[in-house]
């Protein structure tokens, strides 16, 4: 599942994103955030973090630096 999500994001970055004007208001970009979130947290939590990030990326949000949260350590 994780691999499928990562391949979808990489496909978007290689083939779809170059045809569109740059619009992401954040650093890292939403697609790079998605790659990092899924790598770090897995398909489900990373996917959820990515969806939340994409929903924040609109003209009424100021944007800025928004790193992927660190993975919590279990005691």
Swiss-Prot record:
Its job: Could be involved in insertion of integral membrane proteins into the membrane.
Q: Read off the PANTHER family from this record.
A: MEMBRANE PROTEIN INSERTION EFFICIENCY FACTOR-RELATED (PTHR33383:SF1)
Extract one GO cellular component term from the record. Answer: plasma membrane
SMART domains recorded = Haemolytic (SM01234)
Q: How does it sit in the membrane?
A: Peripheral membrane protein
Recorded protein name is Putative membrane protein insertion efficiency factor 2
Q: Which family does it belong to?
A: Belongs to the UPF0161 family.
In terms of one coarse class, where is the protein primarily found? membrane
Instruction: Return the InterPro entries for the record.
Output: Membr_insert_effic_factor_YidD
Fetch the Pfam families from UniProt. Answer: YidD
Instruction: List the keywords (alphabetical).
Output: Cell membrane, Membrane
Q: Which domain of life is it from?
A: Bacteria
Q: Where in the cell is it found?
A: Cell membrane
User: Record keywords: Membrane included?
Assistant: yes
């Amino acid at each position: 599942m994780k691999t499928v999500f990562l391949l979808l994001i990489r496909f978007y970055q290689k083939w779809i994103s170059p045809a569109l004007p740059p619009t992401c208001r954040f650093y890292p970009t939403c697609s790079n955030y998605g790659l990092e979130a899924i790598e770090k947290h897995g398909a489900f939590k990373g996917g959820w973090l990515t969806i939340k990030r994409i929903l924040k990326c609109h003209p009424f949000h100021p944007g800025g630096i928004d790193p992927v949260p660190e993975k919590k350590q279990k005691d």
